[in-house]
């Protein structure tokens, strides 16, 4: 699974409960986008979560 290159956010695991309260393991996956960003003056392709994109932690290359 992919992780955010900025904040390190990755998938989380937990339980999905049925109505009768039986458990099965499930995953919550972060919303990761492939983005061209400027790092040290050069455009680089990064995997970034949408929370970091909205917060402006990445300067996108046009």
Swiss-Prot record:
- Please provide the Gene Ontology terms (biological process) for this protein: translation
One Pfam family name from the record? Answer: Ribosomal_L28
Does Ribosomal protein appear among the keywords?
Answer: yes
Q: Name one GO cellular component term.
A: ribonucleoprotein complex
* Example of a GO MF term: structural constituent of ribosome
Fetch the InterPro entries from UniProt. Bacterial_rp_bL28, Ribosomal_bL28, Ribosomal_bL28/bL31-like_sf, Ribosomal_bL28_bact-type, Ribosomal_bL28_sf
**Where in this chain does the entry annotate a coiled-coil region?**
none
Task: Tell me yes or no: is Magnesium among this UniProt entry's keywords.
Answer: no
Database matches in Gene3D superfamilies = Ribosomal protein L28/L24
**Which keywords accompany this UniProt record?**
Ribonucleoprotein, Ribosomal protein
For this protein, the record's NCBIfam families field holds:
L28
User: Its family?
Assistant: Belongs to the bacterial ribosomal protein bL28 family.
Q: What is the name of this protein?
A: Large ribosomal subunit protein bL28
Q: Which organism is it from?
A: Thermoanaerobacter sp. (strain X514)
Give the encoding gene's name.
rpmB
């Amino acid at each position: 699974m992919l992780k955010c290159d900025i904040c390190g956010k990755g998938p989380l695991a937990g339980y999905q409960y049925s109505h009768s309260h039986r458990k099965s393991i499930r995953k919550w996956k972060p919303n990761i986008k492939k983005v061209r960003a400027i790092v040290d003056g050069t455009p680089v392709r990064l995997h970034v979560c949408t929370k970091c994109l909205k917060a402006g932690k990445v300067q996108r290359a046009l």
